[in-house]
Amino acid sequence: MIVNRYKDAGVDVNAGYELVRRIKGAVASTKRPGYVGNIGGFGGLFDLDSLGYDHPVLVSGTDGVGTKLIIAQKMDKNDTVGIDVVAMCVNDVLAQGAEPLFFLDYIACGHNDPALLASVVQGVAEGCKQAGASLIGGETAEMPDMYAPDEYDLAGFTVGVAEKDRLLSVDTPQAGDVLLGLASSGVHSNGFSLVRKILFKDHDVKLTDKPAELKGKSVGESLLAPTRIYIKSVLPLIKQGLVHGVAHITGGGLIENVPRMFNDGLRAEIAAGSWEVPDIFNYLKQVGNLSDDDCWQTFNMGLGMILAVPADKKEEAKQLLLASGEKVFEVGHLSERTDGEKIFIKLVE
Protein backbone atom coordinates (compact mmCIF):
# COMPACT_ATOMS: atom_id res chain seq x y z
CA MET A 1 0.00 0.00 0.00
CA ILE A 2 2.85 2.40 0.78
CA VAL A 3 4.37 1.76 -2.63
CA ASN A 4 1.02 2.41 -4.34
CA ARG A 5 0.58 5.71 -2.49
CA TYR A 6 4.13 6.68 -3.49
CA LYS A 7 3.33 5.83 -7.10
CA ASP A 8 0.17 7.93 -6.83
CA ALA A 9 2.42 10.79 -5.76
CA GLY A 10 4.44 10.39 -8.97
CA VAL A 11 7.33 8.14 -7.94
CA ASP A 12 7.37 4.61 -9.36
CA VAL A 13 9.78 2.49 -7.31
CA ASN A 14 9.28 -0.50 -9.59
CA ALA A 15 10.37 1.58 -12.58
CA GLY A 16 13.58 2.25 -10.67
CA TYR A 17 14.14 -1.48 -10.20
CA GLU A 18 13.51 -2.05 -13.90
CA LEU A 19 16.04 0.63 -14.82
CA VAL A 20 18.70 -1.04 -12.67
CA ARG A 21 17.96 -4.36 -14.36
CA ARG A 22 18.33 -2.80 -17.81
CA ILE A 23 21.67 -1.11 -17.11
CA LYS A 24 23.49 -3.92 -15.28
CA GLY A 25 25.19 -5.19 -18.41
CA ALA A 26 26.34 -1.74 -19.51
CA VAL A 27 27.72 -0.97 -16.06
CA ALA A 28 29.54 -4.32 -15.86
CA SER A 29 31.19 -3.64 -19.24
CA THR A 30 33.13 -0.72 -17.72
CA LYS A 31 35.05 -2.74 -15.11
CA ARG A 32 38.77 -1.98 -14.96
CA PRO A 33 41.64 -2.93 -12.62
CA GLY A 34 40.91 -1.54 -9.16
CA TYR A 35 37.14 -1.85 -9.37
CA VAL A 36 35.67 -3.60 -6.32
CA GLY A 37 32.09 -4.72 -5.77
CA ASN A 38 28.93 -4.77 -7.84
CA ILE A 39 26.08 -2.46 -8.76
CA GLY A 40 23.50 -1.89 -6.03
CA GLY A 41 25.66 -1.21 -3.00
CA PHE A 42 25.39 1.90 -0.86
CA GLY A 43 28.73 3.15 -2.16
CA GLY A 44 31.14 2.52 -5.02
CA LEU A 45 34.48 0.92 -4.15
CA PHE A 46 37.90 1.24 -5.77
CA ASP A 47 41.24 -0.28 -4.71
CA LEU A 48 43.92 2.32 -5.43
CA ASP A 49 46.79 0.13 -4.18
CA SER A 50 46.16 -2.36 -6.97
CA LEU A 51 47.40 0.14 -9.56
CA GLY A 52 50.96 0.35 -8.25
CA TYR A 53 51.35 4.12 -8.06
CA ASP A 54 54.32 5.28 -5.95
CA HIS A 55 52.92 8.61 -4.72
CA PRO A 56 49.34 8.85 -5.99
CA VAL A 57 47.42 12.12 -5.93
CA LEU A 58 43.67 11.97 -6.47
CA VAL A 59 42.11 14.47 -8.86
CA SER A 60 38.33 15.00 -8.96
CA GLY A 61 35.99 16.65 -11.41
CA THR A 62 32.27 17.20 -11.79
CA ASP A 63 30.16 18.65 -14.60
CA GLY A 64 26.94 18.36 -16.54
CA VAL A 65 25.75 18.49 -20.12
CA GLY A 66 23.85 21.76 -19.86
CA THR A 67 21.08 22.71 -22.24
CA LYS A 68 22.38 20.38 -24.94
CA LEU A 69 19.96 18.03 -23.18
CA ILE A 70 17.04 20.07 -24.51
CA ILE A 71 18.18 19.29 -28.06
CA ALA A 72 18.51 15.58 -27.23
CA GLN A 73 15.07 15.46 -25.64
CA LYS A 74 13.42 17.28 -28.55
CA MET A 75 15.03 14.85 -30.99
CA ASP A 76 14.25 11.85 -28.77
CA LYS A 77 17.90 10.84 -29.13
CA ASN A 78 19.28 10.18 -25.68
CA ASP A 79 22.03 7.62 -26.28
CA THR A 80 24.98 10.00 -26.69
CA VAL A 81 24.52 12.61 -23.95
CA GLY A 82 26.00 10.09 -21.53
CA ILE A 83 29.23 10.26 -23.52
CA ASP A 84 29.05 14.04 -23.17
CA VAL A 85 28.80 14.01 -19.39
CA VAL A 86 31.72 11.62 -19.04
CA ALA A 87 33.81 13.66 -21.48
CA MET A 88 33.20 16.92 -19.65
CA CYS A 89 34.48 15.41 -16.40
CA VAL A 90 37.35 13.19 -17.53
CA ASN A 91 38.84 15.74 -19.93
CA ASP A 92 39.03 18.15 -16.99
CA VAL A 93 41.00 15.76 -14.79
CA LEU A 94 43.21 14.95 -17.78
CA ALA A 95 44.13 18.63 -17.87
CA GLN A 96 45.72 18.10 -14.44
CA GLY A 97 47.67 15.11 -15.75
CA ALA A 98 45.40 12.50 -14.19
CA GLU A 99 44.15 9.13 -15.37
CA PRO A 100 40.40 8.80 -14.70
CA LEU A 101 39.64 5.83 -12.46
CA PHE A 102 35.92 5.84 -11.87
CA PHE A 103 32.75 7.74 -12.62
CA LEU A 104 29.34 8.27 -11.02
CA ASP A 105 26.29 9.69 -12.76
CA TYR A 106 23.26 11.59 -11.48
CA ILE A 107 19.98 11.70 -13.38
CA ALA A 108 17.05 13.82 -12.21
CA CYS A 109 13.76 13.40 -14.02
CA GLY A 110 10.06 14.13 -13.85
CA HIS A 111 9.10 10.58 -14.78
CA ASN A 112 11.24 7.45 -14.74
CA ASP A 113 10.99 5.90 -18.19
CA PRO A 114 13.29 2.85 -17.83
CA ALA A 115 13.88 2.44 -21.57
CA LEU A 116 14.77 6.10 -22.10
CA LEU A 117 16.98 6.41 -19.03
CA ALA A 118 18.69 3.11 -19.79
CA SER A 119 19.76 4.56 -23.14
CA VAL A 120 21.23 7.54 -21.28
CA VAL A 121 23.19 5.27 -18.93
CA GLN A 122 24.36 3.13 -21.84
CA GLY A 123 25.88 6.32 -23.24
CA VAL A 124 27.54 6.96 -19.88
CA ALA A 125 28.98 3.44 -19.99
CA GLU A 126 30.28 4.01 -23.52
CA GLY A 127 31.96 7.22 -22.37
CA CYS A 128 33.51 5.38 -19.44
CA LYS A 129 34.93 2.74 -21.76
CA GLN A 130 36.39 5.43 -24.01
CA ALA A 131 38.00 7.00 -20.93
CA GLY A 132 39.12 3.74 -19.29
CA ALA A 133 37.06 4.49 -16.17
CA SER A 134 34.69 2.25 -14.21
CA LEU A 135 31.09 3.31 -13.74
CA ILE A 136 30.92 2.44 -10.04
CA GLY A 137 27.67 4.10 -9.00
CA GLY A 138 24.98 6.62 -9.68
CA GLU A 139 21.63 8.03 -8.68
CA THR A 140 18.34 8.37 -10.50
CA ALA A 141 15.98 10.80 -8.78
CA GLU A 142 12.37 10.85 -9.93
CA MET A 143 11.06 14.28 -8.94
CA PRO A 144 7.54 15.03 -10.15
CA ASP A 145 6.62 18.72 -10.07
CA MET A 146 10.33 19.63 -10.11
CA TYR A 147 10.66 18.46 -13.74
CA ALA A 148 8.08 17.91 -16.47
CA PRO A 149 7.33 14.24 -17.19
CA ASP A 150 9.44 14.27 -20.37
CA GLU A 151 12.40 16.19 -18.88
CA TYR A 152 15.61 14.96 -17.31
CA ASP A 153 18.90 16.47 -16.22
CA LEU A 154 22.26 14.72 -16.25
CA ALA A 155 25.45 15.34 -14.30
CA GLY A 156 28.48 13.32 -13.32
CA PHE A 157 31.51 13.05 -11.08
CA THR A 158 34.89 11.46 -11.70
CA VAL A 159 38.03 10.72 -9.70
CA GLY A 160 41.40 10.27 -11.34
CA VAL A 161 44.94 9.69 -10.16
CA ALA A 162 48.41 10.90 -11.08
CA GLU A 163 51.90 10.41 -9.74
CA LYS A 164 52.68 13.51 -7.73
CA ASP A 165 55.72 14.32 -9.87
CA ARG A 166 53.65 14.00 -13.07
CA LEU A 167 50.90 16.45 -12.12
CA LEU A 168 50.56 19.34 -14.56
CA SER A 169 50.69 22.77 -12.95
CA VAL A 170 50.56 26.32 -14.29
CA ASP A 171 54.31 26.59 -13.69
CA THR A 172 55.21 23.69 -16.00
CA PRO A 173 54.67 25.35 -19.42
CA GLN A 174 57.59 27.43 -20.68
CA ALA A 175 58.14 30.21 -23.20
CA GLY A 176 58.84 28.57 -26.53
CA ASP A 177 56.48 25.66 -25.98
CA VAL A 178 54.48 24.77 -29.08
CA LEU A 179 50.69 24.65 -28.88
CA LEU A 180 49.11 21.61 -30.50
CA GLY A 181 45.36 21.71 -31.01
CA LEU A 182 43.28 18.54 -31.07
CA ALA A 183 40.17 18.64 -33.23
CA SER A 184 36.78 18.73 -31.56
CA SER A 185 33.79 16.80 -32.86
CA GLY A 186 31.72 19.98 -33.00
CA VAL A 187 30.10 22.19 -30.37
CA HIS A 188 30.76 19.59 -27.62
CA SER A 189 28.74 20.58 -24.51
CA ASN A 190 29.17 24.34 -24.12
CA GLY A 191 27.44 27.37 -25.60
CA PHE A 192 24.06 25.73 -26.14
CA SER A 193 22.06 28.50 -24.53
CA LEU A 194 23.42 30.85 -27.22
CA VAL A 195 22.92 28.18 -29.89
CA ARG A 196 19.28 27.72 -28.91
CA LYS A 197 18.64 31.47 -28.81
CA ILE A 198 20.11 31.94 -32.28
CA LEU A 199 18.39 29.02 -33.95
CA PHE A 200 15.08 28.61 -32.17
CA LYS A 201 14.24 32.01 -30.66
CA ASP A 202 15.77 34.53 -33.06
CA HIS A 203 15.10 32.27 -36.06
CA ASP A 204 12.68 29.47 -36.81
CA VAL A 205 15.25 26.78 -37.56
CA LYS A 206 14.10 23.16 -37.35
CA LEU A 207 16.34 20.42 -35.95
CA THR A 208 15.59 18.39 -39.08
CA ASP A 209 16.69 21.19 -41.43
CA LYS A 210 19.70 20.40 -43.61
CA PRO A 211 21.20 23.77 -44.59
CA ALA A 212 23.76 23.76 -47.39
CA GLU A 213 26.43 24.93 -44.96
CA LEU A 214 26.22 21.62 -43.06
CA LYS A 215 26.83 19.55 -46.21
CA GLY A 216 24.08 16.99 -45.86
CA LYS A 217 23.85 16.84 -42.08
CA SER A 218 20.81 18.04 -40.18
CA VAL A 219 21.06 20.81 -37.61
CA GLY A 220 20.15 18.40 -34.84
CA GLU A 221 22.66 15.78 -35.92
CA SER A 222 25.43 18.37 -36.05
CA LEU A 223 24.58 19.76 -32.62
CA LEU A 224 24.35 16.36 -30.92
CA ALA A 225 27.76 15.08 -32.04
CA PRO A 226 29.15 13.71 -28.75
CA THR A 227 32.00 15.47 -26.98
CA ARG A 228 35.35 13.93 -27.83
CA ILE A 229 37.20 12.10 -25.06
CA TYR A 230 40.97 12.58 -25.27
CA ILE A 231 42.19 10.28 -22.49
CA LYS A 232 43.65 7.40 -24.47
CA SER A 233 45.52 9.65 -26.90
CA VAL A 234 46.88 12.30 -24.49
CA LEU A 235 47.52 10.40 -21.25
CA PRO A 236 50.42 8.33 -22.69
CA LEU A 237 52.14 11.56 -23.76
CA ILE A 238 51.76 13.01 -20.28
CA LYS A 239 53.23 9.86 -18.73
CA GLN A 240 56.18 10.09 -21.12
CA GLY A 241 56.85 13.70 -20.15
CA LEU A 242 56.02 15.07 -23.61
CA VAL A 243 53.36 17.51 -22.39
CA HIS A 244 53.87 20.64 -20.26
CA GLY A 245 50.25 21.78 -20.16
CA VAL A 246 46.71 20.84 -21.18
CA ALA A 247 43.72 23.12 -21.73
CA HIS A 248 40.26 21.57 -22.07
CA ILE A 249 38.32 24.04 -24.23
CA THR A 250 34.91 24.34 -22.57
CA GLY A 251 32.76 27.29 -21.46
CA GLY A 252 34.52 30.52 -22.30
CA GLY A 253 36.14 29.10 -25.41
CA LEU A 254 39.80 29.56 -26.25
CA ILE A 255 39.93 32.99 -24.63
CA GLU A 256 39.09 31.76 -21.14
CA ASN A 257 40.53 28.25 -21.10
CA VAL A 258 43.96 28.37 -22.72
CA PRO A 259 45.36 30.80 -20.09
CA ARG A 260 44.30 28.42 -17.32
CA MET A 261 47.19 26.07 -18.12
CA PHE A 262 50.07 28.55 -17.61
CA ASN A 263 51.15 31.24 -15.17
CA ASP A 264 50.91 35.01 -15.50
CA GLY A 265 54.43 35.27 -16.91
CA LEU A 266 53.37 33.78 -20.23
CA ARG A 267 50.94 34.44 -23.04
CA ALA A 268 49.65 32.23 -25.82
CA GLU A 269 49.90 33.40 -29.41
CA ILE A 270 47.39 31.48 -31.47
CA ALA A 271 47.22 31.74 -35.25
CA ALA A 272 43.59 31.84 -36.33
CA GLY A 273 43.21 29.89 -39.55
CA SER A 274 45.81 27.27 -38.64
CA TRP A 275 43.18 24.58 -38.06
CA GLU A 276 39.93 23.35 -39.61
CA VAL A 277 36.84 25.05 -38.20
CA PRO A 278 33.85 22.64 -38.37
CA ASP A 279 30.94 23.71 -40.55
CA ILE A 280 28.57 24.05 -37.59
CA PHE A 281 30.51 27.03 -36.24
CA ASN A 282 30.50 28.90 -39.55
CA TYR A 283 26.77 28.20 -39.80
CA LEU A 284 26.09 29.51 -36.28
CA LYS A 285 28.22 32.58 -36.91
CA GLN A 286 26.35 33.38 -40.11
CA VAL A 287 22.82 32.73 -38.83
CA GLY A 288 23.45 34.46 -35.50
CA ASN A 289 25.45 37.35 -36.97
CA LEU A 290 28.09 36.63 -34.33
CA SER A 291 31.30 38.61 -34.04
CA ASP A 292 34.68 36.90 -33.88
CA ASP A 293 34.83 37.80 -30.18
CA ASP A 294 31.45 36.15 -29.58
CA CYS A 295 32.75 32.96 -31.15
CA TRP A 296 36.17 32.89 -29.48
CA GLN A 297 34.66 33.53 -26.05
CA THR A 298 31.82 31.01 -26.34
CA PHE A 299 32.74 28.05 -28.53
CA ASN A 300 35.71 25.73 -28.93
CA MET A 301 35.78 26.67 -32.64
CA GLY A 302 37.06 23.25 -33.63
CA LEU A 303 39.68 22.67 -30.93
CA GLY A 304 38.53 20.52 -28.03
CA MET A 305 41.90 20.42 -26.31
CA ILE A 306 45.19 22.30 -26.61
CA LEU A 307 48.53 20.89 -25.47
CA ALA A 308 51.68 22.83 -24.64
CA VAL A 309 54.66 20.69 -25.65
CA PRO A 310 58.41 21.39 -25.70
CA ALA A 311 59.48 22.57 -29.15
CA ASP A 312 62.01 19.75 -29.50
CA LYS A 313 59.32 17.17 -28.74
CA LYS A 314 56.54 18.47 -30.98
CA GLU A 315 57.11 16.06 -33.88
CA GLU A 316 57.21 13.06 -31.57
CA ALA A 317 54.04 14.25 -29.85
CA LYS A 318 52.32 14.91 -33.20
CA GLN A 319 53.09 11.45 -34.53
CA LEU A 320 51.85 9.73 -31.39
CA LEU A 321 48.63 11.75 -31.46
CA LEU A 322 48.05 11.04 -35.14
CA ALA A 323 48.66 7.34 -34.55
CA SER A 324 46.00 7.38 -31.84
CA GLY A 325 43.43 8.80 -34.24
CA GLU A 326 43.53 12.50 -33.40
CA LYS A 327 43.48 15.35 -35.89
CA VAL A 328 46.37 17.55 -34.77
CA PHE A 329 47.14 21.16 -35.66
CA GLU A 330 50.09 23.33 -34.69
CA VAL A 331 48.14 26.42 -33.67
CA GLY A 332 50.69 28.66 -31.93
CA HIS A 333 53.23 28.93 -29.17
CA LEU A 334 53.86 30.35 -25.71
CA SER A 335 55.95 33.47 -25.25
CA GLU A 336 56.99 35.64 -22.34
CA ARG A 337 54.31 38.08 -21.27
CA THR A 338 55.49 41.69 -21.13
CA ASP A 339 54.78 43.75 -18.02
CA GLY A 340 51.36 45.34 -18.02
CA GLU A 341 50.03 43.36 -20.93
CA LYS A 342 46.57 42.06 -20.14
CA ILE A 343 45.89 39.99 -23.24
CA PHE A 344 46.89 36.38 -22.71
CA ILE A 345 45.88 35.12 -26.12
CA LYS A 346 46.77 36.87 -29.34
CA LEU A 347 44.74 35.65 -32.29
CA VAL A 348 46.88 36.16 -35.36
CA GLU A 349 45.26 35.93 -38.78
From Swiss-Prot:
Membrane-crossing residues? none
Q: Which family does it belong to?
A: Belongs to the AIR synthase family.
> Which top EC class is given?
ligase
Name this polypeptide is given:
Phosphoribosylformylglycinamidine cyclo-ligase
Q: Name the Enzyme Commission number(s) assigned to this protein.
A: 6.3.3.1
Question: Gene of origin?
Answer: purM
GO CC annotations, alphabetized = cytosol
Keywords (A to Z) from UniProt: ATP-binding, Cytoplasm, Ligase, Nucleotide-binding, Purine biosynthesis
Pathways per UniProt: Purine metabolism; IMP biosynthesis via de novo pathway; 5-amino-1-(5-phospho-D-ribosyl)imidazole from N(2)-formyl-N(1)-(5-phospho-D-ribosyl)glycinamide: step 2/2
Q: Name one Pfam family in it.
A: AIRS
Q: List the disulfide bonds.
A: none
What is the first-listed, main subcellular location in coarse terms? cytoplasm
Q: What are the GO BP annotations of this UniProt entry? A: 'de novo' IMP biosynthetic process; adenine biosynthetic process
Subcellular localization, as worded in the UniProt entry: Cytoplasm
Q: CDD domains annotated for this entry? A: PurM
